[in-house]
Amino acid sequence: MSRYRGPRLKIVRRLGELPGLTRKMAKRKSPPGQHGAASKKPSQYRIRLEEKQKLRYNYGVTEKQLLRYMQRARRAKGSSGENLLQLLEMRLDTTIFRLGMAPTMLSARQLITHGHILVSEQRVNIPSYQCSPKEKISIRSNSRSRKLIEGYMSTMGSIVTPPHLELKKEKLEGNIQEIIDRQWVGLPINELLVVEYYSPKV
């Protein structure tokens, strides 16, 4: 299943706040569609499915990628749900987004694939690259890269940088201090429902 390219606010109306997909908020609170406002108790399957879809749309990953992350999370020690969120949050595109260098995950992904981003002084063009503590995130030393990211940052206003990251705004650099803690995950999500959704599949 490919990444979503359709109307973003339609997804926000259905699933709720998704900061990685768009910073805009839906004016109408009811789900999209002709019968969106009709009250109907959702099934347990639908509740789990929609929670899983929040991860897909917020982090901009495919179903195949998300399944692989879930498999890795299950193999690791500790809570599978928290492991899954940490894997998604420590991606390079998510890190760029959480540092406030890009307004959405898609914008962060484009910065990376177009070669603007360095990790510990080495160019990395893979958005799914897993960042590690003590790595430094910076941009290429050319005016185009700096102008692009400064433009993004000037339009986003005040951004709260999570404690596992350190932003040096003047230098357009960030340091990864540690693996992110669950309480600082940038998405309202019940990861246990996602684990339950994938239980028959992994």
From Swiss-Prot:
InterPro entries: Ribosomal_uS4, Ribosomal_uS4_bac-type, Ribosomal_uS4_CS, Ribosomal_uS4_N, S4_RNA-bd, S4_RNA-bd_sf. Residues 90-152 form the S4 RNA-binding domain. The keyword Ribosomal protein applies. Residues 18-45 are annotated as: Disordered. One of its GO terms (biological process) is translation. This is Small ribosomal subunit protein uS4c. Disulfide bonds: none annotated. GO terms for cellular component: chloroplast; small ribosomal subunit. It is found in: Plastid, Chloroplast. The lineage of its organism: Eukaryota, Viridiplantae, Chlorophyta, Nephroselmidophyceae, Nephroselmidales. Keywords: Chloroplast, Plastid, Ribonucleoprotein, Ribosomal protein, RNA-binding, rRNA-binding. The gene is rps4. The keyword Iron does not apply. It comes from the Eukaryota. Pfam families: Ribosomal_S4, S4. One of the primary rRNA binding proteins, it binds directly to 16S rRNA where it nucleates assembly of the body of the 30S subunit. With S5 and S12 plays an important role in translational accuracy. CDD domains: S4. It comes from Nephroselmis olivacea. GO terms for molecular function: rRNA binding; structural constituent of ribosome. Part of the 30S ribosomal subunit. Contacts protein S5. The interaction surface between S4 and S5 is involved in control of translational fidelity. Belongs to the universal ribosomal protein uS4 family.
